[in-house]
């Protein structure tokens, strides 16, 4: 398996020109909308997606949106930041090569995790934008595995859903030679993205890592429309429950956004 893993690292896709810089700047909490518009216009594909989204039933504009500036204004800073980061990364992969991979579910839970991390971050003394970006990118390795190893990825999903199967991480290591977090770290390293932005390599007990893990678990529970597991709650149960309830109310809208974008 390790030989296969080493071979696969040679197939890591490159980011679109300017995508790495776009990620760094848009993830900065101090970036304003004018600068985001400038960055988005560097990438015609991202600009087109934002325009399409701003003109969709999801956005429900009163009149046609015809400029990137108006599209960003219509969608709002948080939506533009999240979708631009997701598109900058996501366009490097074709997860449809793996029919078992549910792209809508992946992006919906990733966006929910990003929103949750942003809400939880202040309680841990972590910058909300940094936490949101790290949570959004946490499982990006899944896209790479679905694109580059579709058959192995399908086998991992079959393993994880079997009655006597293991958890997904174990099944991914068995079928693909690495789990989703290891795959993500390989991408971050190859793309030279800073650890502060991705959460990769962070101490498992660090505030940022804890936020990412809790946000991911909560996002999965929200997507499944289940009650918040007590084990998921941090020290302040009431605050965590409040965040969970708030973001749960965004599920339908987030599902629609993920379907439009991906």
PLM regions with names:
Residues 1-157, 161-164, 168-230, 262:
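Conserved alpha-helical "signature site"
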Residues 1-4, 234-262:
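Terminal helices and disordered tails flanking the catalytic cores of nucleotide-processing hydrolases
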């Amino acid at each position: 398996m390790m030989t296969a893993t080493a071979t696969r690292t040679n197939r890591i896709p490159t980011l679109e020109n300017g995508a790495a810089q776009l990620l760094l700047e848009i993830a900065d909490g101090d970036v304003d909308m004018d600068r985001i518009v400038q960055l988005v216009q560097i990438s015609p594909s991202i600009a087109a997606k934002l325009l399409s989204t701003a003109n969709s039933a999801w956005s429900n504009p009163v009149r046609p949106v015809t400029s990137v500036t108006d599209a960003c204004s219509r969608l709002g800073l948080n939506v533009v930041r999240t979708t631009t980061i997701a598109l900058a990364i996501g366009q490097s992969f074709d997860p449809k090569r793996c029919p078992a991979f549910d792209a809508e579910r992946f992006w919906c839970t990733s966006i929910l995790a990003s929103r949750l991390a942003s809400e939880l971050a202040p309680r841990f003394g972590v910058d909300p934008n940094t936490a949101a970006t790290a949570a959004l990118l946490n499982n990006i390795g899944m896209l790479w595995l679905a694109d580059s190893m579709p058959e192995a990825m399908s086998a991992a999903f079959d393993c994880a859903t079997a009655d006597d199967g293991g958890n997904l991480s174990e099944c991914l290591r068995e079928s693909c030679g690495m789990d989703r977090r290891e795959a993500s770290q390989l991408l971050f390293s190859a793309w030279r993205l800073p650890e502060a932005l991705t959460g990769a390599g962070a101490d498992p007990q660090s505030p940022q890592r804890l936020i990412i893990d809790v946000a991911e678990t909560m996002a999965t529970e929200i997507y499944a429309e289940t009650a918040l597991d007590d084990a998921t709650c941090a020290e302040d149960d009431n605050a965590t429950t409040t965040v969970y309830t708030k973001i749960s109310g965004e599920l339908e809208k987030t599902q629609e956004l993920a379907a439009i974008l991906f």
